Amino acid sequence: MLFPALALLCPVLVAAHGQLSWVQVGTGPQYPAWTLDDYYTALYRESDPVWGALPEQKYTRKTDRTDLGFADIFSKSIATGGYEVCKRFDDMSPVGTIPAKAGDQVIVQWSSEWPSEGHPGPIGEWMAKCPNDSCTQVDATTLDWFCIAQHNYDAEIKKWPTEILTESLNRQWIFTLPTDLPPGAYLVRHELIALHNSTGPTPDLVSSPQHYPIGIEIMLDSSGTTLPTLTCKFPGCFSYDDYEWHHNIWDDEWQGLLVKWEFPGIAVYPGGYTTGVVNGASAAVKNGMSSSPSSSSGVSSSSSSSVASSDTSDSTTSSGVVAVNVSAASSPSSSISANSAMATGKKTCKRKKRSKIAGQKRHIHRSRVAHLDRH
């Protein structure tokens, strides 16, 4: 039978990168995300509709990337991670819609396999309003997308957002929904970008930045009236002209140029926010208002429970991962440092040394090898 053979492959394939386990919006429950297990269940149901079990309803858009790999920026899958499979399996198992309120915090729980060490890069969030107050089976490539958050390199602690996520104890990432959008159905796009393989300065599909998008369907309760006009479509938001295609972060790190990083695609609309450093200046902006450089990146403070409590919004900064036992009164920058240290425990220094060596062995990319040879 096809299904058992595919099931045996799952443990090997899942280890390649990773996937979401669940999504939580505001103080709501943890909604399960679509995983490779669901994909193989749907695949078996498709081949045997009599005996094959129906996959359970999940709350993120489907993907069929069996290696959990990145999406080509020029393909339709760049929208939410799995264009063809959404059309293929949505009748079998429709994507669930999560209720949300303006200003809610969204927690995305990544699996233990991702992001693996050696995949430094930024994190971004996008939204698109669906027609007729429903995102059910809406083609994400036809929507007008606007950017609500960009999380860039943090020059204070010298880490990329994906590195902060990797070092966090529970691998959760938090972002905030805008407060000025009109109510209705939206697709939310959460994306990790890995820059370890981008060689620059000549665009090359083989040695390219890697985008890992996830799609979440929400029904937004809001009193806002502003629908952003600065939009783009996927594919189309990203191009060869973006900064990420023309720069090697390993060389930029050696030359002190990481602070020059520019996020790909269009700018964040005024109701969104940006963290980190962009083109040499602090990009700490929230809801269109400049904030102090010290708040350019942050981690949320929470209890060790993975369920958000009612006061989470009071102790969470604009970007970050859930930190355990970090005081809400501490500054965002110190919270990140504390989170990184606590995530690794007492073996922080030793682990960093081992991971650096292991990272060089695992990721023998041409750009990194060239950098090591020269320096």
Swiss-Prot record:
Keyword set, alphabetical order: Carbohydrate metabolism, Cell wall, Cellulose degradation, Copper, Disulfide bond, Glycoprotein, Metal-binding, Monooxygenase, Oxidoreductase, Polysaccharide degradation, Secreted, Signal
One of the record's GO molecular function terms: monooxygenase activity
Phenotype of null mutants: Impairs virulence in mouse lungs and in Galleria mellonella models.
CC cofactor: Cu(2+)
Record note on cofactor: Binds 1 copper ion per subunit.
S-S bridge residues: 130-135, 232-237
Biased composition (Low complexity): 290-341
A single cellular component GO annotation: extracellular region
Gene3D superfamilies: 2.70.50.70
EC number, as in UniProt: 1.14.99.56
Residues the entry annotates as binding O2: 196
GO terms, biological process: cellulose catabolic process
Region (Disordered): 287-375
Keyword check for Repeat: no
Induction: Expression is induced under host-like conditions in a RIM pathway-dependent manner.
Glycoprotein as UniProt keyword: yes
Biased composition (Basic residues): 347-369
InterPro entries, per database record: AA9 (IPR049892), AA9_LPMO (IPR005103)
Ligand binding (Cu(2+)): 119, 212
Subcellular location(s) per record: Secreted, Cell wall
Stated role: Lytic polysaccharide monooxygenase (LPMO) that depolymerizes polysaccharides via the oxidation of scissile alpha- or beta-(1-4)-glycosidic bonds, yielding C4 oxidation products. Catalysis by LPMOs requires the reduction of the active-site copper from Cu(II) to Cu(I) by a reducing agent and H(2)O(2) or O(2) as a cosubstrate. Required for the expression of stress response phenotypes, including thermotolerance, cell wall integrity, and efficient cell cycle progression. Promotes intrinsic fungal cell wall remodeling events required for efficient adaptation to the host environment.
Family affiliation: Belongs to the polysaccharide monooxygenase AA9 family.
Protein name per its UniProtKB record: AA9 family lytic polysaccharide monooxygenase CEL1
Organism: Cryptococcus neoformans var. grubii serotype A (strain H99 / ATCC 208821 / CBS 10515 / FGSC 9487) (Filobasidiella neoformans var. grubii)
The organism's taxonomic lineage, starting at the top: Eukaryota, Fungi, Dikarya, Basidiomycota, Agaricomycotina
